[in-house]
Curated annotation (Swiss-Prot):
InterPro entries: GnRH, Gonadoliberin
Pfam families with a match to the protein in the record: GnRH
PROSITE patterns named among the record's database cross-references: GNRH
GO cellular component: extracellular space
The protein, known as: Progonadoliberin-2
Similarity-based family: Belongs to the GnRH family.
Modified residues (Glycine amide): 33
Cellular compartment(s): Secreted
TM spans (from-to): none
One Gene Ontology term of the molecular function aspect: gonadotropin-releasing hormone receptor binding
The keyword Signal is annotated on this UniProt entry: yes
Keyword Signal attached: yes
Signal peptide residue numbers: 1-23
Length: 85
């Protein structure tokens, strides 16, 4: 019983740590260090992104960490309550 709880706690910490880290992954068209191949985008698309960020509407760049962590905790609590019933 103790070992299974320890494994569950370790898995939960691993998931939360992965969500909270600022690790960079490679995506199509991106290179290490955040450099992007600009040939694949039109200049109008790039300028629109810059205009949106200058206007302060860059909320899509910020991850929603609180909601992810809250959902994980609520799911765990719901499972515990279901086990007790």
């Amino acid at each position: 019983m103790c070992v299974s709880r320890l494994v569950l706690l370790f898995g939960l910490l691993l998931c939360v740590g992965a969500q909270l880290s600022n690790a960079q992954h490679w995506s199509h068209g991106w290179y290490p260090g955040g450099k992007r191949e600009l040939d694949s985008f039109g200049t109008s698309e790039i300028s629109e992104e810059i205009k949106l960020c200058e206007a302060g509407e860059c909320s899509y760049l910020r991850p929603q960490r609180r909601s992810v962590l809250r959902n994980i905790i609520l799911d765990a609590l719901a499972r515990e309550l279901q086990k007790r019933k």
